[in-house]
């Protein structure tokens, strides 16, 4: 079928320029709005990838503007319950400012003590939050929260633009794949719910640096990303697994070393000045029970919550399952899968087994969907499920305060299940796409490379392959 031809073409001609309006039926239909698909005799990338990347960066302002407009009611009237849930304009950004004393500034955070800010965030985000919080002038709590939200809206807009740019730069022969980020409905819904886009942008920079053989910079960016949330650890593991198959572990040691040095340096600085603040988010995770978006919240909504230790064990088991699946995928596929493909499969397993799977966590999947080259059809089906769950979770929370107007728990669980199925389908689609590629010819010393992010592994033959019987 067309999907098979699409997959095979990327293997047999890995250097060909990919034009979505030619290869993706949905993109071809949508292109009619701006003049139709690229002509038969037109020269793809005639003006270079930078031109298209700049256009996509500009286009990314559209979902960001929609995300800001969605929060308009709360910006004007304040983030108050249950209205912020009925109007679906909740954001962790102003909530953290008000609840964690971020206005005291980064100096107070590093000084520690009873009056220090207490953001339950990993070290780098805590530093950024307190740094920006200290810039907010005195005023009423509502005005200060509004200003803080505005500052972070600008920062996250820049982070989204950088994510689009770095992704397009990682795919110089197929930069339009970054449109999956610039035009994603998932971004429009969740970009301003929390500061996750900071870590997403840092991870995109790390993947570009890896693909360009800039190992030290890749380690720095990836280390900083890990200091915003733990998901980038999956990318590091995926790179290591793919490198093991290629037999080029030496090229990865610099990356791993710089990642560890960066994490140790920033974490050590914060821990030296404020030990409690450095570990607060990790302690909070250990002590938390099942949260929204997680399948483990089902028993809680049914009136029989799982013990915290059981939820922690299930989440840890999810990480183990992700590592095992990632290793099998990376080492057992007929042809070496790409770094982004292994990362996406592992990330999906971690997300759907996590203690909580908040709406903004899906932002981490968006760049990977772009990098692996999924079609827009899969993207939009997934985005539809995300939108369904997005509305359901806020209406359920509103119903906690106003039961006769909110969403019953049973209907919320239906929306949650639909989202989990859609996210798992992304991993299935990537798995099938990678498994359909024919094995490399063992007689070729430098087999054609199908991974645009291969970096130092480009053209490497398999050194370790697990045969699947």
Show the residue positions of the predicted features.
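Aromatic/glycine/proline-enriched transmembrane-helix motif characteristic
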Residues: 292-353, 431-469
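TM-lumen/periplasm interface segments of multi-pass membrane proteins
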Residues: 4-172
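Aromatic-enriched
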Residues: 381-469
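Membrane-interface alpha helices of multi-pass inner-membrane proteins
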Residues: 186-189, 205-207, 216-242, 265, ...
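Short acidic/glycine- and proline-prone juxtamembrane loop motifs at membrane-interface regions
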Residues: 191-199
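Membrane-lumen/periplasm interface segments of specific transmembrane helices
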Residues: 251-322
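Perimembrane helix-loop-helix junctions
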Residues: 234-261
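Specific aromatic-rich, kink-prone transmembrane helix
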Residues: 166, 199-215
């Amino acid at each position: 079928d067309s999907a098979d031809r699409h997959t095979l073409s990327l293997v047999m001609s890995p250097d060909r320029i990919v034009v979505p309006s030619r290869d993706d039926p949905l993109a071809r239909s949508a292109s009619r709005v701006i003049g139709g698909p690229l002509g038969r005799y037109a020269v793809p990338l005639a003006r270079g990838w930078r031109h298209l990347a700049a256009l996509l960066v500009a286009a990314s302002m559209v979902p960001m503007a929609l995300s800001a407009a969605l929060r308009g009611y709360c910006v004007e009237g304040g983030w108050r319950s249950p209205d912020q849930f009925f109007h679906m304009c909740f954001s962790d950004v102003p909530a953290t400012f008000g609840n964690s004393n971020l206005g005291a500034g980064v100096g107070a955070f590093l000084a520690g003590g009873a009056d220090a800010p207490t953001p339950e965030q990993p070290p780098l985000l805590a530093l950024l939050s307190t740094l920006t919080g200290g810039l907010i002038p005195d005023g009423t709590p509502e005005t200060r929260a509004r200003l803080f939200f505005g500052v972070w809206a600008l920062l996250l807009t820049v982070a989204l633009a950088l994510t689009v740019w770095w992704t397009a730069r990682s795919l110089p022969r197929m930069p339009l794949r970054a449109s999956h980020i610039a035009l994603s409905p998932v971004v429009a819904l969740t970009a301003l719910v929390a500061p996750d886009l900071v870590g997403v942008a840092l991870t995109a920079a790390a993947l570009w640096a890896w693909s360009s053989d800039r190992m030290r910079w890749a380690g720095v960016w990836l280390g900083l990303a890990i200091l915003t949330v733990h998901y980038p650890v999956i990318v590091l593991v995926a790179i290591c697994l793919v490198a093991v198959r290629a037999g080029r572990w030496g090229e990865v040691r610099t990356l791993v070393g710089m990642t560890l040095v960066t994490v140790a340096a920033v974490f050590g600085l914060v821990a030296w000045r404020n030990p409690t603040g450095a570990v607060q988010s990790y302690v909070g995770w250990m002590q938390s029970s099942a949260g929204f978006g997680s399948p483990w919240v089902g028993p809680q909504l049914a009136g029989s919550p799982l013990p915290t230790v059981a939820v922690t064990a299930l989440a840890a088991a999810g990480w183990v399952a992700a590592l095992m699946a990632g290793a099998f995928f990376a080492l057992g596929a007929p042809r070496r899968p790409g770094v982004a493909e292994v990362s996406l499969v592992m990330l999906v397993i971690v997300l759907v087994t996590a203690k909580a799977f908040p709406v903004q966590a899906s932002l981490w999947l968006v760049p990977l969907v772009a990098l692996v080259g999924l079609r827009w059809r899969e993207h939009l089906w997934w985005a539809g499920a995300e939108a369904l769950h997005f509305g359901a979770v806020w209406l359920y929370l509103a119903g906690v305060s106003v039961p006769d107007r909110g969403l019953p728990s049973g209907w919320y669980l239906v929306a949650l299940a639909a989202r989990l199925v859609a996210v798992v389908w992304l991993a299935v689609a990537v798995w099938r796409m990678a498994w359909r590629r024919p094995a490399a010819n063992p007689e070729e010393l430098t087999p054609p490379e199908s991974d645009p992010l291969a970096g130092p592994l480009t053209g490497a033959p398999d050194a370790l392959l697990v045969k699947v019987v």
